[in-house]
Amino acid sequence: VNTLRRAAHVTLTVAAIAVATACSAGGTTTPAASVTGAAGTATQAPATQAPGAKAAALAPRAASKTARKAGKPKLGIADITPMGEKVERVGVGFPIIVTFDRAVRDRAAAEAALQVQAEKPVEGAWRWVSDRKVVYRTKTYWKPHQKVLFTARLSQIPGNEAAKDVSRRFAVGTANISVVDTKKHVMKVRRDGKLAKTIPISAGRGGLPRNGVDVYLTTTGVHLAMGKKRVETMTSSWLGVTDPKDPLYYKLEIPWAVRISDSGEYVHQSAGDYQFLGKSNQSHGCVRATPAGAKWFYGISQRGDVIEVTGTKRKLDWRNGWSYWQLSWNQWKRGSALPAGSASASPTPSASPSAGEDALQG
C-alpha cells in the first residue's frame, strides 16, 4: 500500500488572519456548524461544534503483547476532520486535518504513518501548519462521487507500538464549484461541470480600514465551505462595537448562512436591501444573495465545496480557515516533512479496516 507524503512545519501566524469582516458571526472566528448531509439536504451538527470536534483521543491497544511491553502510546490523535459520527459527504476541495495530542518531535515518521486511499486516486500531500496539526490537500480537486479512506497507522511509528490505529471514511459528493464575480455582482454555481444556477449577489463595499486592511471588502481567492447554519447571529462585537447607539453597531439574525472563511465571511441571504443585489456591492464583507438563491445554495452545500471570489483588492490568506488552495502545488509540497512531498493515493480497498484499527464509527 502506497503512503502519501506528508508535511514540514509552517508557522501559523494567527495575527495574519485575525482581521475579520463585519459579517463576523457573534464577533468570533469559530467555524460554523458542519455540513454532514448529502447534497440537497440540510443535516447539521450542533451550532457550537467546530469541524472535527468529535474526534476521539487514541487509547493503548490492550490485546498485543508488544503493546503491553511498550507501555503507553507516546503519540495519539486529539482531533480529525472529517468527523467520525457518520460517513460525511464532502466537496471536491475538502482537506483532511489531523491534530495530534501533543507536539510531534519526529514529523517525518508521523507523516509517513498517515495514508489516504481513494476509489479514484489523485496526487496529494500533507503540510504541517503547527507542531501538532497537519493538513492533507490534493494537487487537483478530488474526483466527485467516490469514497475515500484515511488511516493513521500510529502503531507503526517507532516507539509508539502501543497506539491504536485510526481510520476515517468519507464520500466525495457532487462537484459544487461556484465563482463569485464581485464586479458583475453575480455568483455562478456549477454542479459536476454544468451551470446549475446564476444568483444575483452583493459583495463587500469596502471603506473601513483596520490595521492596513479594508475589512469591508470580500477577500479574493479560492474559499472552501467550512460549515453552514440555518440562522446565524452576526454582530459588530469583533470591531469592539457593542453600544447599540454606535452608528457601526449591528446585531442581525441571518438566514441560510454558509461559512467560507475564519474571518467571518459567509454566503447568506441578504437582510433587506434587495435592490442592490446584482447591481452594486453594499455588504460588510459577506456575499449577500437573494432569499431563493441563498436557500438553494445552503441546501446543496457540503463542507469542502469550492467558492472562488474574484474582483477585489483584498487577497485571501491561505491560513484563513480552509483556504489551502491559495497556495500553488509546489508551495504546498514544501510544507511536507518527507523528501518528495507527494505521492498518488492508493486505490481504496473493498475490505473494512482490520481488527487492529479503530474505525471510530466512520
Language-model features: where?
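Low-complexity, Pro/Ser/Thr- and charge-rich linker/hinge segments at domain boundaries
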Residues: 50, 66-70, 168-191, 209-210, ...
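Exported/periplasmic cell-wall-interacting domains
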Residues: 174-175, 217-220, 235-362
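Soluble periplasmic/extracytoplasmic beta-strand elements of cell-envelope proteins
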Residues: 97-99, 179, 188, 224-226, ...
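Acidic, low-complexity Ser/Thr/Gly/Pro-rich repeat segments typical of extracellular/periplasmic
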Residues: 2-19, 24-175
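Solvent-exposed coil/turn segments that connect beta secondary-structure elements
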Residues: 101-105, 119, 131, 139-141, ...
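Residue-level detector of high-confidence beta-strand sites
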Residues: 198-200, 222
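Short, solvent-exposed cationic patches
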Residues: 215-232
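Second-shell loop/turn segments in exported
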Residues: 84-87, 136-139, 212, 244, ...
